[in-house]
Amino acid sequence: NNIFDQFFNDFFSQNPNNKKSLGSGVLINKEGYIITNEHVVARASEIRVALGDKREFKARVIGADMKSDLAIIKIDSDQFLPFIAMGRSDDLMIGEQVLAIGNPFGLRHTVTTGIISALNRNIRVGKNKVYSDFIQVDASINPGNSGGPLLNINGSLIGINTAIYQKAEGIGF
């Protein structure tokens, strides 16, 4: 195994026998509630959460909605849990600067920046699934970012990174 092969295995290889998946989420209160995507936790037999301070927790699903692709999971801790303030998505403007945070390709705690490209987008996933009222951004979103926070420039939560348009770069939702 040479270094070239190792690079491609680390970043591009898909092991069909590997039952693990990777996603992101965002703590929304000190009680340990986390918003993520439904597709991140769907069919999971165990959910593990790693915080930026390297603490790890087992989590449980509190609720999930396939139609909106959102889920709430919970971790339990008797220590302080850092959480993000909720923003408002009803007064967003096209051109507004945003930050997308996540774990693209397993690269933990990655931050990318961009702008809101459009509002109220409907996107089709597969043949029968349509998601409504999405925020379109040009911040880099990749596999592993799903469930991570989309923040306004003040650091308030305004959305959840959910999908990318795979036929082009720079189109995320």
Q: What annotation goes with each model-predicted range?
A:
Residues 1-173:
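Serine-dependent protease modules
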